[in-house]
């Protein structure tokens, strides 16, 4: 669920069906009306951009391109070649929490050696933790942390010739506001897609 391909989309409410270009393909029983104009009832277009392998959508056609908004993040993450990473599995979780608290928690790794001492914190030292500065007009924040060279995960595969030196065992944690958060490691990537389920 949440991925794949199709040639059409069908609304689960009235069963109107749209082609992937947004044109209305079918609308059951609407031929019985005298004002139905299929050509005028397509989906509204949404601007879509691909940045570093991620698909970003915006309803605001006047907003600057994603690559411009995230320009100072690009040199930090492009060395990983994340656009070549592949999905291995997905999970869905429901948490009884305020999504903003989850975002705040994700944006700092100061807690890792304590709260996650049996997992990622076991191969991480606060002294090596670095944070990128967030300017007034920034649309993102990031931090990166270097794991010990003997860490069981988070290290580049021997055949990886993109990453050199300390970057072979350094992970980056970007947060693109308001809710795109992920861990980009030399050997894997995982992300959170937050969808608040009420107020």
Map each language-model feature to its residues.
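Rieske [2Fe-2S] iron-sulfur-binding domain
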Residues: 1-61, 67-75
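C-terminal catalytic domain of Rieske-type non-heme iron oxygenases
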Residues: 49, 54, 58-199
């Amino acid at each position: 669920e949440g991925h794949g391909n199709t040639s059409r989309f069908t609304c689960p409410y009235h069963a109107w069906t749209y082609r992937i270009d947004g044109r209305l393909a079918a609308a059951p029983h609407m031929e019985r009306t005298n004002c139905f104009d299929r050509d005028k009832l397509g989906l509204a277009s949404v601007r879509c951009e691909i940045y570093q392998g991620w698909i970003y959508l915006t309803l605001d056609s006047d907003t600057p391109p994603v690559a411009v908004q995230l320009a100072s993040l690009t040199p930090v993450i492009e060395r990983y070649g994340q656009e070549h990473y592949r999905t291995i599995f997905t999970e869905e979780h429901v948490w009884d929490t305020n999504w903003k608290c989850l975002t705040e928690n994700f944006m700092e790794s100061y807690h890792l050696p304590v709260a996650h001492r049996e997992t990622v914190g076991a191969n991480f030292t606060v002294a090596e933790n670095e944070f990128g500065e967030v300017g007034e007009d920034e649309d993102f924040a990031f931090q990166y942390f270097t794991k010990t060279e003997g860490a069981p995960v988070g290290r580049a595969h021997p055949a990886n010739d993109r990453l050199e030196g300390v970057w072979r065992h350094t992970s980056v944690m970007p947060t693109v506001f308001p809710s795109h958060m992920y861990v980009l490691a030399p050997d894997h990537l995982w992300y959170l897609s937050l969808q608040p389920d009420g107020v």
